[in-house]
Amino acid sequence: MADVLSVGVNLEAFSQAISAIQALRSSVSRVFDCLKDGMRNKETLEGREKAFIAHFQDNLHSVNRDLNELERLSNLVGKPSENHPLHNSGLLSLDPVQDKTPLYSQLLQAYKWSNKLQYHAGLASGLLNQQSLKRSANQMGVSAKRRPKAQPTTLVLPPQYVDDVISRIDRMFPEMSIHLSRPNGTSAMLLVTLGKVLKVIVVMRSLFIDRTIVKGYNENVYTEDGKLDIWSKSNYQVFQKVTDHATTALLHYQLPQMPDVVVRSFMTWLRSYIKLFQAPCQRCGKFLQDGLPPTWRDFRTLEAFHDTCRQ
């Protein structure tokens, strides 16, 4: 290391220059001490002035002498060679200004976004691997030529079993009334009334929930011929939102081997809307956002969230 530093540098002159710097600092300090002390130790004013001027001139001459000596030695020191390696310290001058090139913040944001995308993709992959998109008990990935064509088990349950499951669910929730009808044969249709908050039309095939429509408590749910209206939407945006969330819940609660558990889980989730207009958002703490109450209910905790706060 010493050999690298000594290239092109007179070390003896360098040492003398350091001593000259110290001498120059001492001379400058004496000048300021002289100015600070002022005129002293003389009886007459004229004598004090002459002594002060003489002492001040001597100090200035000392400063001038030491400065000339330092300039002379600085010429003898020489310049270090520019070829010695700086290693990583040579890259310090290449660092960009944070205000002009916010590269770090952009990379950090991209990294967080990529992490979040990977996390949600993993969750979606796990759910899709567990649940068949056909909502049947058939195994996925088997060639259609090799497996027999089986009827899904959820579509061949006897009506008595379906009635018994719905009756038990109706008794589980006192604030929820369920009216079952079969206007088109064996397929059941449910009219679920949740307190005085809303009504839900549930179209079923055996114990498989095919469609849900949520409407307000005072809205008409029947057509002109007295049948349940399974096509028209609610006139209120809040219940249209709840209908969309209920459709999402149908895709979430899927277990083809245990269809009664699926229906009970969906009804438990639907029951959480009993406080649709009373529960605040668990994230922002507000009751209204864009004129709407918290319409989303978490599938596990059943906590209320606004549609924009749940993400």
From Swiss-Prot:
Q: Which organism is it from?
A: Sus scrofa (Pig)
Query: What GO cellular component is one of the record's annotations?
Result: nucleoplasm
Keywords of the record, alphabetical order, are: Activator, Methylation, Nucleus, Phosphoprotein, Transcription, Transcription regulation
Q: State how it assembles.
A: Component of the Mediator complex, which is composed of MED1, MED4, MED6, MED7, MED8, MED9, MED10, MED11, MED12, MED13, MED13L, MED14, MED15, MED16, MED17, MED18, MED19, MED20, MED21, MED22, MED23, MED24, MED25, MED26, MED27, MED29, MED30, MED31, CCNC, CDK8 and CDC2L6/CDK11. The MED12, MED13, CCNC and CDK8 subunits form a distinct module termed the CDK8 module. Mediator containing the CDK8 module is less active than Mediator lacking this module in supporting transcriptional activation.
Q: What is the lineage of its organism?
A: Eukaryota, Metazoa, Chordata, Craniata, Vertebrata
Modification Phosphoserine occurs at: S132
- Chief location of this protein? nucleus
Q: What does this protein do?
A: Component of the Mediator complex, a coactivator involved in the regulated transcription of nearly all RNA polymerase II-dependent genes. Mediator functions as a bridge to convey information from gene-specific regulatory proteins to the basal RNA polymerase II transcription machinery. Mediator is recruited to promoters by direct interactions with regulatory proteins and serves as a scaffold for the assembly of a functional preinitiation complex with RNA polymerase II and the general transcription factors.
- Kindly indicate whether the keyword Cytoplasm belongs to this entry: no
Gene Ontology biological process terms in this record: regulation of transcription by RNA polymerase II; somatic stem cell population maintenance
Protein's name according to its UniProt entry: Mediator of RNA polymerase II transcription subunit 27
Quote the Pfam families the UniProt record gives: Med27 (PF11571)
Where does the UniProt annotation locate this protein?
Answer: Nucleus
A molecular-function term among this protein's GO annotations: transcription coactivator activity
Task: List, alphabetically, the InterPro entries matched.
Answer: Mediator_Med27 (IPR021627)
Modified residues annotated as N6-methyllysine in this record: K134
Indicate the family of this protein. Answer: Belongs to the Mediator complex subunit 27 family.
